[in-house]
Curated annotation (Swiss-Prot):
This is Small ribosomal subunit protein uS8. It holds the Pfam family Ribosomal_S8. Belongs to the universal ribosomal protein uS8 family. It comes from Pectobacterium carotovorum subsp. carotovorum (strain PC1). GO terms for molecular function: rRNA binding; structural constituent of ribosome. One of the primary rRNA binding proteins, it binds directly to 16S rRNA central domain where it helps coordinate assembly of the platform of the 30S subunit. Part of the 30S ribosomal subunit. Contacts proteins S5 and S12.
Amino acid sequence: MSMQDPIADMLTRIRNGQAANKVAVTMPSSKLKVAIANVLKEEGYIEDFKIEGDTKPVLELELKYFQGKAVVESIQRVSRPGLRIYKRKDELPKVMAGLGIAVVSTSKGVMTDRAARQAGLGGEIICYVA
């Protein structure tokens, strides 16, 4: 059976892994998942990530905890295969009044809402992380 929304699966694995206090979670790798993982690492939501395997690459994310609590309080899919959500640069949302991030896929790559606003770019809102 094929997976309908691999990004939602990635976010669910992160959410479930942190709920179970796992050190790391693994999932099938793709360019978009690696780009999202890179944004999460730059923003301090995960410790690190690595890609293993050649024929079927596997993405492994090291989850991050602070004083025993998960750093990611909430992670929510916004744009999905059945309903894509696109926003212009002036319409980009501020998650939790700027405390969280929106991961945006732009013409210049995957970045946070703050970086997209600075670059003057809009794009597809992939998810919210707080």
